[in-house]
């Protein structure tokens, strides 16, 4: 797959609210779009924010990074997405709040923002389908776009239902998930389970992320596994999976071989683990990857 079209990103933009009140901008779709912008792919992010100061922060951050904000809708009632982070015995727990602005995507406005654009693929996660309004909007966008879909499975209790997630996978060409998610959906988290999952849902490729054990990609040519690079000083792993997804998309856009895509995605995800948070505003962070001819 080699194309000059733009990636279309649909999903949640939200703030992680830490126990000390600090807000960190994120959401998997925004994180992926953020990296794709740095890669020069000019993604269009379709999301929805609220009538609040947090929304102003979203617009400000995206505009400063040079991102197209024409797909960002502003709701008059529901707040900008928020996840409340608490610490229990030193371990973080996440309360993904209900009825946020991103749960109320306006399909008509989304399609209007796509007018005149050429889109190479559609990326979305599974959280955006937790409510009927945004789930319906996503379905209409898919129908309008008729482009291949990359679904990033993120099973966050209690915000997912087995049949709905399976339906989103079946409408995709590529799917990414972790070992626990594969076990929940397929009953097995091993290599045969990945291959069976790909065949069952007629996917071109399945990406299985395995934390410090690396990742694997299963496609029609078989399964390729790789461990992460050694000697990485991990600060936190927030956003590592989103970094992987972004490089996988970059590889699709430039028709990289599967082995190269896997190696580069792991390298970039490891680099993101050396910073605090899922994204970085220093373009020098991306320079070494550009110098290696990634884009």
Map each language-model feature to its residues.
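A structural signal for the hydrophobic beta-strands that form the central parallel beta-sheet
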Residues: 9, 45, 123-124, 239
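Short secondary-structure capping/turn micro-motifs that flank functional sites
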Residues: 52-53, 78-79, 158, 183, ...
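Conserved phosphate-binding/catalytic region of the ribokinase-like
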Residues: 1-6, 191-295
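Hydrophobic pocket-lining residues within nucleotide cofactor-binding pockets
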Residues: 49, 127, 232
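Substrate-binding N-lobe of the ribokinase-like
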Residues: 6-7, 18-83, 87-91, 98-102, ...
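Ribokinase/PfkB-type carbohydrate-kinase core domain
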Residues: 1-8, 60-74, 88-224, 294-295
